[in-house]
A protein has these predicted regions:
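Ligand-binding pockets and gating/stacking loops
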Residues: 1-501
Length: 501
């Protein structure tokens, strides 16, 4: 059976995406298909006043690459080091100078240190919650909570940033033609689907409609390094792709990943012909609302599979081996390179998640084995991928038009808690580069131990407002939810003028 997406993510009514998007089953061509979908298309947005976009840089970004570091990187071992603090605060890693005056990076980020003059660093992000909050960080949800992050279909869920961009673009320009690169892709695999514990809620379009959900890829490749990992129990050994992957690794739209090896384009076209006949019958029998959504879902399934543009964009072997090595022959490095290929091919918004793999408290969630994980995996992987992405975009003349976002949901505790640092939302950092942004820029300051914000407190909603501004969406706009209530894109978030060029 041919499928558009490989994950089993459920909609709020309990129907899985796999149920809705199966090509060749009743969910796309059956007579009763529309009854599965109570409401998939959001209402028209309400756009804010013209003077809301008077700041510079509005609409400057043509494409966006979001690198999301799930788990909460330590601000004290990355962008906000405190060498004058007591050793129990500052830790044992040493600072080095960067090309951005006044900014010291960790000694394990030497390549990043050489490109920070192209970057804006925000070191004064703050919120009161100490839990993983990707929903809070990347949507308009005004508050965070554990149920919000872990409950599918939570009533307070808001549409993911990339889905909002996709929605506004289609309101203005209509859908892309058949075979074009999709505009809201996420790598490398469905959020938290490769860890041993329960999954977090993956980003979605919520009330905007499932056709604006991010399209996840599937990773195909073998890890080259084994890791011994321990969460809060016995240690376990497994092969970790974030430490290294074989060169023949690749990313697939999950539809292609699910196909049998002998599935040909001829078979695809024959199936399309059959579906067209069934579709004609279905249209004659049922003219309910929502029909266009199902048509678009089916068309997307085929376009993802028979499009030369999509196949080419996902062919990492077209890249020079030297450049692939510079990005890092790791899952994060190759995901970041794949993101560059996708925006170069015309994708509007690509997200790469450095996700947990194998065990709970993996990724950047360094409760245990803090230093070994930072120095052996996390910092070197980020160092290569981000620095090479900036240099690569610049060399291709793309950095002025592409917006690069490096975001996370929180920082780490100033004091160690056993073998690592705990969750800390009161002070953390994000950094950004590219279209419409000021270069070589530091915003905000924390106290002497990196525990609280001492100057220019900002929130994730302020960051979102600034991103929307640069993308060309008025951050004061509202969207109607399923009950036709206006919901602000960023709630009380305001554009950060110091970030703008």
């Amino acid at each position: 059976m041919l499928q558009v997406l490989g994950g089993h993510k459920r909609l709020c009514n309990g129907v899985t995406r796999r149920d809705l998007l199966t090509v060749g089953g009743l969910s796309l061509c059956g007579v009763g298909a529309p009854t599965l979908i109570p409401s998939l298309v959001g209402a028209e947005p309400t756009v804010g006043k013209a003077d809301d976009v008077a700041l510079p840089g509005f609409g400057r970004a043509k494409n966006v690459i979001l690198l999301y570091l799930f788990g909460g990187p330590s601000q004290l071992e990355t962008l906000d080091m405190k060498p004058q603090a007591p050793v129990e605060i500052r830790g044992k890693l040493q600072p080095i100078d960067s090309t951005l005056p006044g900014l010291h990076l960790c000694e394990h980020l030497p390549n990043m240190a050489r490109v920070m003059d192209r970057v804006t660093v925000v070191r004064s992000l703050t919120h009161p919650w100490n839990f993983h909050g990707m929903q809070y960080a990347t949507t308009g949800s005004p508050e965070g909570s554990v149920p919000l992050e872990e409950t599918l279909g939570h009533p307070q869920h808001q549409p993911f940033l990339g889905s909002v961009v996709n929605y506004f673009d289609q309101q203005r320009q209509g859908s892309k033609p058949h075979g074009a690169i999709p505009d809201n892709l996420m790598l490398p695999f469905l959020l938290s689907s490769r860890r041993s514990a329960a999954r977090y809620t993956a980003p979605s379009a919520m009330y905007l409609g499932s056709r604006f959900d991010p399209i996840w890829t599937e990773f195909r490749g073998e890890a080259t390094h084994s890791a011994v990992r321990r969460s809060h129990g016995p240690a376990a050994e497994f092969r970790d792709p974030y430490l290294g992957v074989q060169r023949d690794c690749r990313f697939l739209i999950a539809a292609e990943a699910d196909l049998p090896n002998d599935f040909s384009l001829d078979r695809l076209n024959r199936r399309r012909s059959l579906l067209d006949q069934l579709e004609t019958l279905r249209r004659n029998l049922d003219q309910q609302a929502g029909r266009s959504v199902l048509d678009q879902k089916r068309e997307l399934a085929f376009s993802l599979l028979d499009s030369k543009a999509i196949r080419t964009a996902f062919d990492l072997e077209q890249e020079p081996a030297k450049l692939r090595d510079e990005y890092g022959l790791t899952l994060f490095g190759q995901s970041t390179l794949q993101a560059r290929r996708l925006v170069e091919a015309g994708c509007r918004f690509v997200t790469v998640v450095w996700d947990e793999f194998g065990q709970l408290n993996a990724g950047w969630d360094t409760h245990v084995d803090h230093y070994n994980r930072l120095t052996g995996e996390l910092l070197p992987g980020l160092d290569l991928a981000f620095s090479t992405l900036i240099r690569d975009l610049e060399a291709r003349g793309m950095l002025d038009d592409a917006l690069v976002l490096v975001m996370n949901e929180m920082g780490r505790t100033p004091r160690f808690e056993g073998e690592g640092r705990g969750h800390w939302g009161r002070a953390y950092s994000n950094f950004f580069a590219g279209a419409g942004l000021k270069r070589g820029n530091i915003i905000g300051r924390t106290d002497a131990i990196g525990a609280t914000v001492a100057d220019r407190p900002l929130t994730a909603k302020d960051v979102l407002a600034t991103i929307y501004h640069l993308i060309g969406i008025n951050p004061n706009s509202t969207l109607d939810d399923r009950l036709n209530r206006p919901v602000p894109l960023c709630h009380d978030g305001k554009v950060i003028p110091e970030m703008l060029a």
